[in-house]
C-alpha cells in the first residue's frame, strides 16, 4: 500500500483538488487501484450544515455522506465511488477521540493531540487505504493554517510508520505572475516549502500553478531552493478545461515520476478516451445556453456537480453548454415572462434547469420558471426542490389548487409537498435527512425509462420533503405523469409531462453520478433537447 499526501501553499483555492484528481486519473490509467481521501480541518462533523455561500456544494455519497465538493471531483476524474469516511474532518476526529475517552478506552492516560489525535488520523487513513494500491490524501487549507497542524504532524509521522518507500509528499504552490514586470515569482513558494520543512515534511514533488509556462531557469531555481530534483518541479499552468489538467501533468511526466519514486511498475497510461473527451470539450460543433434558476448563484461552486454534469452532456453531444445564471428572486415579479422571453429571443436560453435548495427565499421565482418552461415548451429539468416546485406549479396552474409546500407555508390549504413521515419528529439538522442512494422503479415506456434504458434506477438523495401521496391521484388525473416511484410505491421519485419537448424532474440529485465518460442520462436528454430547433 502506497500513500501520496498533497499539501497546498501560498493561497487557498489553488487547485489541490484538481491536481489530486488528475493524479488519480493518471495512476488509474496505468492499471492501479486508486483511493482518494479529503481532509478538511474544520470542526464540523461533515459539510451538511454548512452554508452553500461559505462552502459551496455539499456532495452526497452513495452511503449518505454529506461531504466536501472535492469528493465530487475525485469521483468524476477517477470514476470511483467514495464513501462518507473518505472525507475526514477535525470534527470527526475529535468526536471519535472524545467518545473513546468517555468510554475509558485510554485507560486513564492524559488525552493529547500527540499521540491520540494524530493516531486517530493515521488509523483512519490506513483503514481506508487497505484495499487500494495507492491512496491519495489531500490536506485542505494552506500550510501555515493553525487548523491543519495536527494533520500535518500525522502525515509527517506516516513515513516512519509505513516506511519512506511507501510515502510521497506533493506540494502544490502558486507562482504569482507579475504582469507589469512580465515575471513569475518564486519567493512565495520558497517560503511555503520552508514552512513545510519546518514542520518536518520535505516535499518530494513540487507542482507549480501558474498562468503561463514555467521556464527552465525557474525550475532550476525552485529545485535549488526547495531541495527537490529538477524533474520533480512540475508545471501546472492554467488549462482550457479542468479535464485537460491530467493530460498536461502527464506531459510534464508526473505519472511516471510518481511510480518511480514509489517503486511501482510504470506502464503507458491508456488516456485515449480521456483525450477524446477533452477534444470534444475544446472543439464543440454546437453551442447552447441552459438557464440555472438558483438561490445561491453568487457562489457558483454551490452548483459544482450540476455545472460539470451539463459539461459532460455537452461533450457527449459535441456542444458547448453555456450557463445563464438566473437569480430566482428576480423572477418573483409579474414581468418574469418578459425577462425570460428576452433571453429566448436573444438566443441566450435554450433550456431551463431548476436545482435543489432549502428555504422559501426565491421559491415563487423557481415556480414561475417552471411555468414558463411548461407553457412555452422549453426543455426543462428539475432536481430535488426543482421537482417540488414543478409539482407546486402544476397543482396551482393546471389543477387549480391553492397549493404550496409545508416547508414554505405550514398552513397551506393544499400541501402538495409535505414532510416524509419519518422526518416529522426529527429535531437535529446534521445528517438526519433522507440521504444517499435509493432505488426507484420507473414506468415502462415513460421518458424516464427511455432515458435510463431500464425500469430500474438508483440515485442519491438529500431531502426531508416529498410529493404528498394524498395528491398523487389529482395530479395524475390532470395530466402529470409520476413516472418513478420508490419500490414500496409510496414516494414519488420522477415526474414528467407528455406532449412536451422535454419536461422531467426527479426528487434525487442525478448530478452526483455524472462522469465525463458517462454523462448522466437526464442531463444528456436536456442538452440534446435544447440543441434541437
Curated annotation (Swiss-Prot):
GO terms for biological process: 'de novo' CTP biosynthetic process; pyrimidine nucleobase biosynthetic process. It comes from Methanococcus maripaludis (strain DSM 14266 / JCM 13030 / NBRC 101832 / S2 / LL). Mg(2+) binds at residues 70, 138. Its EC number is 6.3.4.2. It comes from the Archaea. Pathway: Pyrimidine metabolism; CTP biosynthesis via de novo pathway; CTP from UDP: step 2/2. Pfam families: CTP_synth_N, GATase. The lineage of its organism: Archaea, Methanobacteriati, Methanobacteriota, Methanomada group, Methanococci. Residues 289-533 form the Glutamine amidotransferase type-1 domain. This is CTP synthase. Keywords: ATP-binding, Glutamine amidotransferase, Ligase, Magnesium, Metal-binding, Nucleotide-binding, Pyrimidine biosynthesis. Catalyzes the ATP-dependent amination of UTP to CTP with either L-glutamine or ammonia as the source of nitrogen. Regulates intracellular CTP levels through interactions with the four ribonucleotide triphosphates. UTP binds at residues 12, 185-190, 221. Homotetramer. L-glutamine binds at residues 357, 385-388, 407, 464. Coiled coil: none annotated. One of its GO terms (molecular function) is ATP binding. Residues 1-264 are annotated as: Amidoligase domain. It is an enzyme of class 6 (ligase). One of its GO terms (cellular component) is cytosol. SUPFAM superfamilies: Class I glutamine amidotransferase-like, P-loop containing nucleoside triphosphate hydrolases. ATP binds at residues 13-18, 70, 237-239. CTP binds at residues 12, 145-147, 185-190, 221. The active site is at 384 (nucleophile), 509, 511. CTPSs have evolved a hybrid strategy for distinguishing between UTP and CTP. The overlapping regions of the product feedback inhibitory and substrate sites recognize a common feature in both compounds, the triphosphate moiety. To differentiate isosteric substrate and product pyrimidine rings, an additional pocket far from the expected kinase/ligase catalytic site, specifically recognizes the cytosine and ribose portions of the product inhibitor. Allosterically activated by GTP, when glutamine is the substrate; GTP has no effect on the reaction when ammonia is the substrate. The allosteric effector GTP functions by stabilizing the protein conformation that binds the tetrahedral intermediate(s) formed during glutamine hydrolysis. Inhibited by the product CTP, via allosteric rather than competitive inhibition.
Amino acid at each position: 500500500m502506497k500513500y501520496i499526501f498533497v499539501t497546498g501553499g501560498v493561497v487557498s483555492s489553488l487547485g489541490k483538488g484538481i491536481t489530486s484528481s488528475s493524479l488519480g486519473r493518471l495512476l488509474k490509467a496505468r492499471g492501479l487501484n486508486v483511493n482518494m481521501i479529503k481532509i478538511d480541518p474544520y470542526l464540523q462533523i461533515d459539510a451538511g450544515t454548512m452554508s452553500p455561500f461559505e462552502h459551496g456544494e455539499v456532495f452526497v455519497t452513495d452511503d449518505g455522506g454529506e461531504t466536501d465538493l472535492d469528493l465530487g471531483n475525485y469521483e468524476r476524474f477517477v470514476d470511483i465511488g467514495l464513501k462518507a469516511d473518505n472525507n475526514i474532518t477535525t470534527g470527526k476526529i475529535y468526536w471519535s477521540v472524545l467518545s473513546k475517552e468517555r468510554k475509558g478506552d485510554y485507560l486513564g492516560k492524559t488525552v493529547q493531540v500527540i499521540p491520540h489525535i494524530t493516531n486517530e488520523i493515521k488509523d483512519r487513513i490506513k483503514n481506508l487505504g487497505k484495499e487500494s494500491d495507492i491512496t491519495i490524501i489531500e490536506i485542505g487549507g494552506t500550510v501555515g493554517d493553525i487548523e491543519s497542524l495536527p494533520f500535518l504532524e500525522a502525515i509527517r509521522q506516516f513515513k516512519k510508520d509505513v516506511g519512506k518507500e511507501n510515502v510521497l509528499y506533493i506540494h502544490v504552490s502558486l507562482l504569482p505572475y507579475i504582469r507589469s514586470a512580465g515575471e513569475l515569482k518564486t519567493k512565495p513558494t520558497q517560503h511555503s516549502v520552508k514552512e513545510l520543512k519546518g514542520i518536518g515534511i520535505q516535499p518530494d514533488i513540487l507542482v507549480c500553478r501558474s498562468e503561463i509556462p514555467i521556464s527552465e531557469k525557474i525550475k532550476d531555481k525552485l529545485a535549488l531552493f526547495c531541495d527537490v530534483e529538477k524533474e520533480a518541479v512540475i508545471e501546472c499552468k492554467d488549462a482550457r478545461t479542468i479535464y485537460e489538467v491530467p493530460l498536461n501533468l502527464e506531459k510534464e511526466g508526473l505519472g511516471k515520476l510518481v511510480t518511480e519514486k514509489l517503486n511501482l511498475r510504470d506502464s503507458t497510461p491508456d488516456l485515449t478516451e480521456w483525450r477524446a473527451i477533452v477534444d470534444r470539450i475544446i472543439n464543440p460543433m454546437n453551442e447552447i445556453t441552459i438557464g440555472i434558476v438558483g438561490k445561491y448563484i453568487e457562489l457558483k461552486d454551490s452548483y459544482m456537480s450540476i455545472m460539470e454534469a451539463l459539461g459532460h452532456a455537452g461533450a457527449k453531444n459535441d456542444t458547448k453548454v453555456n450557463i445563464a445564471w438566473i437569480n430566482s428572486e428576480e423572477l418573483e415579479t409579474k414581468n418574469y415572462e418578459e425577462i425570460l422571453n428576452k433571453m429566448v429571443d436573444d438566443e441566450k436560453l435554450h433550456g431551463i434547469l431548476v436545482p435543489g435548495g432549502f428555504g422559501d427565499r426565491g421559491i415563487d421565482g423557481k415556480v414561475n420558471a417552471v411555468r414558463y418552461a411548461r407553457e412555452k415548451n422549453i426543455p426543462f429539468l428539475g432536481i430535488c426542490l426543482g421537482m417540488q416546485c414543478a409539482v407546486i406549479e402544476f397543482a396551482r396552474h393546471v389543477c387549480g389548487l391553492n397549493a404550496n409546500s409545508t416547508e414554505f407555508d405550514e398552513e397551506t390549504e393544499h400541501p402538495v409537498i409535505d414532510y416524509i413521515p419519518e422526518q416529522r419528529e426529527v429535531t437535529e439538522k446534521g445528517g438526519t435527512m433522507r440521504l444517499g442512494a435509493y432505488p426507484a422503479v420507473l414506468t415502462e415506456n415513460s421518458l424516464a425509462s427511455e432515458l435510463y434504458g431500464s425500469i430500474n434506477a438508483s440515485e442519491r438523495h438529500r431531502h426531508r420533503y416529498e410529493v404528498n401521496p394524498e395528491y398523487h391521484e389529482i395530479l395524475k388525473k390532470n395530466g402529470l405523469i409520476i413516472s418513478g416511484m420508490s419500490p414500496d410505491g409510496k414516494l414519488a421519485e420522477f415526474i414528467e409531462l407528455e406532449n412536451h419537448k422535454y419536461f422531467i424532474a426527479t426528487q434525487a440529485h442525478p448530478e452526483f453520478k455524472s462522469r465525463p465518460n458517462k454523462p448522466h442520462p437526464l442531463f444528456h436528454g436536456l442538452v440534446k433537447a435544447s440543441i434541437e430547433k
